[in-house]
């Protein structure tokens, strides 16, 4: 599998507001606010009333508590005397009530016992009872039994009260949530403390300068109003994922020192009709109350897509939300003092009314960083990491074209994890190399065992690297490896020496030729019947490149023509499928030109490999033994094997 460069694709909180209803009454010419009684207070009042109603029933139904007969009593000292005089027949001790029931000798059988109030310590009484052989024992009082009965009754009542409170609370929460659906879920910070400053943002200097000016607008508006300048109402950050759009918004919030609202585009629309528009109104109402302020809407394409028919009829609620957003941003009333910052990676799907000046006055492109930007980003993210002095950040920046800021941060983090796993004290170039491979191609797999399959893969990968090295218009080879990563059994890496914004026809043909060289090497060594499915991904890539050369870039015998329209988004009311603005005859010619380009490049790769069969075998033996050949060593071996005949052939191929 040949890897040329990173491909970058464009992909595409919440606090409930609370409302307290009030009743306004006129009192001596002044307005007095009377809070409506809360449902929770009503619930507790009802529970208390129910308990008070039940208590008389519980206590009234207990005859022991309702009736208390007056009984004869003795003092504690008198009881001791009667025990000494052997006048006591039996004593019942009630430790709970701290009383003793005394039965005297000669007392009538139906006479009630005499009650005596006990002390906390009754050891003397018990010793005297034992000495005089008086019968005594412990009993439980009627009051203790009544307490047990009360607890049993409460065991039935408390669950009922708790259940009633639960139902009341749920009904209260349901009504409260229903009233709060229309409230904005934007997170509000009076002075946002994000921990991010403009010094923490690197690699996107142009975008940073634009947004620093917005902060200056907020802090020193007189500098601009003095010359008649108007504060921009909106700034749209556009760029692929991972380039730092949200990081820039955090930096603005940390630098501006003004109230800051942040919300995601998906937090506007809910399941209920009208909620989205209501939340937009509530958001801008709060913003006007705190002006001057900033509003950050992340992923605005979730609510700002183009209005149109699309497929189905379920997009009307989103359109209402967008219409309300357009009105609030630049409608009849205006929103002086509010600056809106939005971020998206799908600017092509946004409604044109949203993008016009007066709503989003500026569109700031936040693209993947160049070499200088990548170096600055690596310097920022390496501040808190232990990096070996031998590691060159500039070399890392050169070998990572197409990497975004998020990719570079992840790269250094993976290198730090590998360093800790290997129990090293600092990150070395070995961990950096492994981290790059892991980020681009995936996890490292189990090494291949020595077999025919391993040697076949070695021929395939050496074919890519050898042809790419022989063609002068091709990017230099960086590494050829047999270590499996992700879905690939082997990998060949090519890294450009410089940033390439434009690609020539000869460069495209060189890439097609080297990509086909893997299949060509298999056919030369093992024969056409033994070619494998390993070149399937390579064939898809070269077919796509060749077709684009013919239909999009005008690099074929058909002339400088663009023959295919871009596919539209069906859910935006655009084309259902690609439109072909040419006849069947032209379509046949397109197919013929695509086949001609691919076949020509395939024959070129076969000729180069056959001419350099000796060096190919040498490289395959070395790769099978070491499993990885670095780019410098690979190019050195190829240059040592060059001869005048090969050089003459290469000059002819490169001139085609």
UniProtKB/Swiss-Prot annotation:
A Pfam family matched in the record: AAA_lid_3
TM annotation in the entry: 46-66, 148-168
Lumenal side of membrane: 67-147
Localization per record: Cellular thylakoid membrane
Keyword terms of this UniProt record: ATP-binding, Hydrolase, Membrane, Metal-binding, Metalloprotease, Nucleotide-binding, Protease, Thylakoid, Transmembrane, Transmembrane helix, Zinc
GO biological process assignments: protein catabolic process; proteolysis
Cofactor remark from the record: Binds 1 zinc ion per subunit.
Residues annotated as catalytic: 461
Cofactor: Zn(2+)
Sequence ranges on the Cytoplasmic membrane side: 1-45, 169-656
Family according to the record: In the central section; belongs to the AAA ATPase family.
HAMAP family: FtsH
Name of the protein in question: ATP-dependent zinc metalloprotease FtsH
Species in which this protein is naturally found: Nostoc sp. (strain PCC 7120 / SAG 25.82 / UTEX 2576)
């Amino acid at each position: 599998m040949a890897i040329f460069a990173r491909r970058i694709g464009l992909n595409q909180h919440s606090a409930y507001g609370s409302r307290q209803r009030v009743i306004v009454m006129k009192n001596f010419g002044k307005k007095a606010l009377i809070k409506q009684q809360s449902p929770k207070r009503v619930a507790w009042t009802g529970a208390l009333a129910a308990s008070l109603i039940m208590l008389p029933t519980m206590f009234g139904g207990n005859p022991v508590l309702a009736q208390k007969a007056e009984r004869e009593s003795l003092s504690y000292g008198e009881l001791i005397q009667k025990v000494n005089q052997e006048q006591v027949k039996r004593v019942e001790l009630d430790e709970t009530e701290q009383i003793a029931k005394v039965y005297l000798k000669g007392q009538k059988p139906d006479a009630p016992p005499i009650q005596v109030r006990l002390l906390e310590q009754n050891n003397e009484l018990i010793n005297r009872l034992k000495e005089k052989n008086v019968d005594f024992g412990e009993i439980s009082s009627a009051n203790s039994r009544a307490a047990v009965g009360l607890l049993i009754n409460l065991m039935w009542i408390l669950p009922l009260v708790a259940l009633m409170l639960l139902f009341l609370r749920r009904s209260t929460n349901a009504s409260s949530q229903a009233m709060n659906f229309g409230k904005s879920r934007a997170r509000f910070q009076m002075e946002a403390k994000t921990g991010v400053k403009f010094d923490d943002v690197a690699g996107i200097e142009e975008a940073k300068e634009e947004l620093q000016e917005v902060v200056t607008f907020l802090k020193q508006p007189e500098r601009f109003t003095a010359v008649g300048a108007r504060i921009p109402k909106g700034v749209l950050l556009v760029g692929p994922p991972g380039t730092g759009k949200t990081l820039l918004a955090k930096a603005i919030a940390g630098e501006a020192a003004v109230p800051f609202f942040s919300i995601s585009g998906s937090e506007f629309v809910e399941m209920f009709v009208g909620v989205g528009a209501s939340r937009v109104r509530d958001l801008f109402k709060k913003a006007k109350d705190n002006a001057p302020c900033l509003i950050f809407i992340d992923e605005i394409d979730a609510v700002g897509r183009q209005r149109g028919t699309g497929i189905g009829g379920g997009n009307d609620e989103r359109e209402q939300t967008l219409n309300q957003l357009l009105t609030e941003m630049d409608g009849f009333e205006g929103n002086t003092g509010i600056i809106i910052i939005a971020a998206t990676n799908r600017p092509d799907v946004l409604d044109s009314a949203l993008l016009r000046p007066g709503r989003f006055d500026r569109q700031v492109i936040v693209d993947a960083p160049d070499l200088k930007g990548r170096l600055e980003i690596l310097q920022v993210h390496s501040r808190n990491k232990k990096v070996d002095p031998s590691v060159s950040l500039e070399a890392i920046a050169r070998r990572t074209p197409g990497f975004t800021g998020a990719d570079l941060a992840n790269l250094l983090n993976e290198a730090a994890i590998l360093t800790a796993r290997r129990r090293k004290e600092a990150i070395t170039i070995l961990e950096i190399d492994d981290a790059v491979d892991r980020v681009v191609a995936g996890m490292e797999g189990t090494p291949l065992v020595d077999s025919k399959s391993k040697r076949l893969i070695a021929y395939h990968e050496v074919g890519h690297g050898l042809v790419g090295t022989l063609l002068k218009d091709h990017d230099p080879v960086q590494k050829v490896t047999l270590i499996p990563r992700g879905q690939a059994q082997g990998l060949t890496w090519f890294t450009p020496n410089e940033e390439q914004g434009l690609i020539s026809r000869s460069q495209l043909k060189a890439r097609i030729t080297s990509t086909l060289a893997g299949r060509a090497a298999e056919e030369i060594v093992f024969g056409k019947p033994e070619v494998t499915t390993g070149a399937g991904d390579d064939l898809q890539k070269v077919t796509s490149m060749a077709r684009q050369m013919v239909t999009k870039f005008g690099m074929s015998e058909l002339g400088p023509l663009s023959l295919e329209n871009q596919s539209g988004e069906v859910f935006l009311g655009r084309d259902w499928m690609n439109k072909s603005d040419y006849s069947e005859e032209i379509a046949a010619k397109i197919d013929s030109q695509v086949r001609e380009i691919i076949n020509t490049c395939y024959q070129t790769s076969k000729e180069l490999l056959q001419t350099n069969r000796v060096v190919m075998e040498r490289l395959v033996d070395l790769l099978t033994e070491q499993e990885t050949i670095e780019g410098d060593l690979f190019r050195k071996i190829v240059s040592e094997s060059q001869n005048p005949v090969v050089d003459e052939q290469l000059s002819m191929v490169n001139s085609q």
